[in-house]
Amino acid sequence: MNLAPTKGHEQSGLRPVLVVSKYNFNKYTNMAVVCLIISNNKKFPTHYELRCVNKVKGSVLCEHVRSIDYCARNLSFVEKLKEEELDEIIDILMGIIEI
């Protein structure tokens, strides 16, 4: 997905993202909440290194959460993350927003 335009420390350009919102939210709003994925791992506490996927390599930036209108963007499904990994990422997100 193309993340432009951005400002400051925000990531931009064409890159993979991980959808962290629930299916029903996505379906009824035509929106999705996503976290960016980068190709390197800087071992930051809010980064999660992907381990169980084949096509997408890198780290999920849990601090870079965005809501996107996926109908207005040129998106394509690549692969599904294992439930255990998604649960770990959700735990990091919950820690960031202190739920």
Predicted regions and their residues:
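Conserved functional hotspots at enzyme active or ligand-binding sites that engage polyanionic ligands
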Residues: 1-99
